[in-house]
Amino acid sequence: MRNRILFLFCLLSLFGGCGFQEPTQWKEWRDQFVLKDNPEGTISISEAITHSGGDEILIMAQVGGGKGDTFDNKVASFLVSEAPDKEHLGKPGHDPDGCPFCKQKLANAPTVTVGFETNDGKAIPVDARKLFGIKKGDVVVIKGKGSYEESTKMLTLNATGMHVVSR
């Protein structure tokens, strides 16, 4: 009996510390990219397309949009589309997916690919959902430099900061 208890104790000691421990690099990236305060002066994605000549821009957008997957599960990259109008944003009981005005606006809205890079210019190798705790439908403010590709009608934003406005 004593041997069984000793064996069980050893087994529990061995597996007790096997939980997932987040790499310290993730915290460093969060500290680098997560904006504590909601920045002022955001523009729409449509406006950002005309200002995407290499200058830093600040957009308010909704995570998700376009066809296909919103997130890349290998790197910190995701799609965003136009955020709901400010008068609709955060209204109790408002469902942008069921609102005819929001649906009409979003139907033809451009999509943006947002990516986060390391200091040496490589894509951060962590799913943005894990790194930043975001999900489809969140409204975010993204700060970064953009480039617009006319052939794909896609704005690509190399993000330097992000603030989650609403979940």
Predicted features and spans:
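OB-fold and OB-like single-stranded nucleic-acid-recognition modules
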Residues: 18-167
